[in-house]
Amino acid sequence: MQKIIKLKDLKIGNDLPFTLIAGPCQIEGLDHALFMAEELVKLTTRLNIPFIYKSSFDKANRTSVNGARGLGIDKGLEVLAEVKRAFNCPIVTDVHSENQCAEVAKIVDMLQIPAFLCRQTDLLQAAAATGKIVNVKKGQFLAPWDMKNVHKKLESFGAKDILLTERGTCFGYNNLVSDMRGLAIMAELNTPVIFDATHSVQQPGGLGGSTGGERKYVELLAKAAVAVGVAGLYMEVHQDPDNAPSDGPCMIRLDNLERVLTKLKKYDEITKEK
């Protein structure tokens, strides 16, 4: 029987209706965060889709030194706390160093380990020590079966609730490919698996000083993942992605999200019907 993780009133499991993890790539300010959260909460409530709000206080791995990194941990956590207070929705954000974990855990419901840092033992240990759910993104450089070692590290440090997220694999230069077998392989670890549909269309460093992407393939890959069967979908969303400070080429447009989610929910129901 597949493991089910409980978060507030949500249940996250590979055999359950998918949970949506969504929000803008980085926190741009309080007003923008509240606007995005309100729109996403209203939409997912209307469609009866379990929802977790995601946004980053620091984009620490930008391609260029000139790339916008975000509000930073202090102001960023203040914004996330306001979102949580206003809408009572679960929150996830990423951590980049061990000394951030305890502070971030005071505000959020789930800690996320970035793909580039997924093998950093000290970071995994610090995240596990918070007692929060830990979502680890599979490194673009790792095979899906290698995530068993990451999973074992977290378990050895006492983590009880672990999510693994597929976000594409390096395929030559400036390109990623999604191997849908990886979703099933990681699920064999008896842990909920998430598919990151927006970062999977990234073209890392593809614009020279920033990351490119192929937004037009987000829906296609999300359909494929839902057809395989996943516990959740991860989508970064923006009302004006072409003018977003980071990952604009990958993010799905807010005004297109309802149409996409409506389709995905139908696919999900077919995949998981008894």
Curated annotation (Swiss-Prot):
EC number annotated for this UniProt entry: 2.5.1.55
Cellular component, GO annotation: cytoplasm
Reactions mediated catalytically: D-arabinose 5-phosphate + phosphoenolpyruvate + H2O = 3-deoxy-alpha-D-manno-2-octulosonate-8-phosphate + phosphate
Main localisation: cytoplasm
Keywords noted in UniProt: Cytoplasm, Lipopolysaccharide biosynthesis, Transferase
Keyword Transferase: yes
Compartment(s): Cytoplasm
Biological or metabolic pathway of the protein: Carbohydrate biosynthesis; 3-deoxy-D-manno-octulosonate biosynthesis; 3-deoxy-D-manno-octulosonate from D-ribulose 5-phosphate: step 2/3; Bacterial outer membrane biogenesis; lipopolysaccharide biosynthesis
Pfam families per record: DAHP_synth_1
GO molecular function: 3-deoxy-8-phosphooctulonate synthase activity
One GO BP: keto-3-deoxy-D-manno-octulosonic acid biosynthetic process
Family of the protein in this entry: Belongs to the KdsA family.
Protein name, entry field: 2-dehydro-3-deoxyphosphooctonate aldolase
Lineage of producing organism: Bacteria, Pseudomonadati, Pseudomonadota, Alphaproteobacteria, Rickettsiales
